[in-house]
Amino acid sequence: MGMYPGVLEPSSRGGLPLEEVTLAEVLASSGYLTGMAGKWHLGVGPQGAFLPTNQGFHRFLGIPYSHDQGPCQNMTCFPPATPCHGGCNQGIVPIPLLANLSVEAQPPWLPGLEARYVAFARDLMSDAQRQDRPFFLYYASHHTHYPQFSGKSFTGRSGRGPFGDSLMELDAAVGAIMTAVGDLGLLGETLVIFTADNGPETMRMSRGGCSGLLRCGKGTTFEGGVREPALAFWPGHIAPGVTHELASSLDLMPTLAALSGTSLPNVTLDGFDLSPVLLGTGKSPRKSHFFYPAYPDEIRGVFAVRSGKYKAHFYTQELTTSPGSAHSDTTVDPACHATSPLTAHEPPLLYDLSKDPGENYNLLEGTTEVTPEVLRAMKQLQLLKAQFDAAMKFGPSQMARGQDPSLQICCKPRCTPYPVCCQCPELQPRGH
């Protein structure tokens, strides 16, 4: 689909190609009422061509990209008047809050944003019940991305600073949505999945999160950059417990299609149906996973491969191509730093993640003898990489389509001086 390298910008010409079939489109075709709240970040395009309402969502309330992709030095992140930390991106329009294709505010009042998203979620679920329809809600909160923000009820309450306050509000939002599901009497009919997209941005230090015992963070193919928690809740269907089966966000679409009885598009997908794992009827069909860097190419292919408990790194490099993207700087491990060069490893770095999730002990070096099992695992990982790279076809890069400043969303079209004139700020509510 060409969603590489890096990420889309407010003025990007590219976006998620419309010929790609989304999960929302699959479920909408089966009668689901679909809605999305939060961060989109899959492109805007001319007249909003790539926005959620053109990708299978009946309703959308959110910011079309990351909330740091706009000037934020004059914005309030914590009430009553604590400004956002840092200046974010300059020389572009303030971040817009969209309701479907219309600008609700530019910029929005960030301390009140999560509450608006929760209200949107409640309304979607209530309307679906009133229409006797199933619903699909994609809730992509901005928490705990930099710059952190939170509402009045959470500011200064966590004891963990801005990051903790942001996380506390996210926790409350999830709780409010779950309460709404229960109030509608839908707990036994609703599958809830909670997960995240990448590891901590350790360059932000206390404002970026912590990867704990995992190595490095966002922007790397080490576990600190790619391993995320995942929770699934469905009373009467999913028994409480913990699984160590291998899973990926790529598996969500085939899994939800199977559970909802909907048909998948006739294309090759990288995901697997994980319903046997969720329902306790079998093991994960996913036996391996492949990790690309942020700036992939067809020559090197995937940087790392996992099969079962073993993971091999064939190449390592921090994300350094764009300015300010040294996401894992400030850690003591030099392999995480922006100054870390692209390194081809021959033999590859090999780790047993069941015993060493921190990727500290390379099984192919040191004083201990390399066992036959380890050698077999290494050969298997090399074979998997060769087969995967040979089969992969890179689509045309959407990011390489470049940028057009006129595509930036402005609540006052053709105003001057552009882009600072694009201001339709949301008023601060009383008492906040």
Question: Model segments located where?
Answer:
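Active-site segment of extracytoplasmic enzymes that catalyze sulfate/phosphate-ester chemistry
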Residues: 1-35, 46-47, 52-59, 69, ...
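Active-site rim elements
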Residues: 9-17, 104-111, 160-164, 217-219, ...
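Active-site-proximal alpha/beta segments of enzymes that process anionic O-linked groups
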Residues: 16-46, 70, 76-79, 83-133
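Loop/turn elements at helix/coil->beta-strand transitions in domains of secreted/extracellular proteins
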Residues: 29-35, 55-58, 130-137, 186-192, ...
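Histidine-centered active-site microenvironments of extracellular/periplasmic hydrolases
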Residues: 48-56, 147-150, 155-166, 172, ...
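C-terminal cap/loop subdomain of S1 sulfatases and analogous C-terminal strand-loop tails that border
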Residues: 58-59, 63-71, 81-82, 200-221, ...
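Active-site His/acidic residue clusters
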Residues: 75, 101-102, 121-165, 201, ...
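Long, internal low-complexity/basic segments
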Residues: 252, 307, 312, 317-320, ...
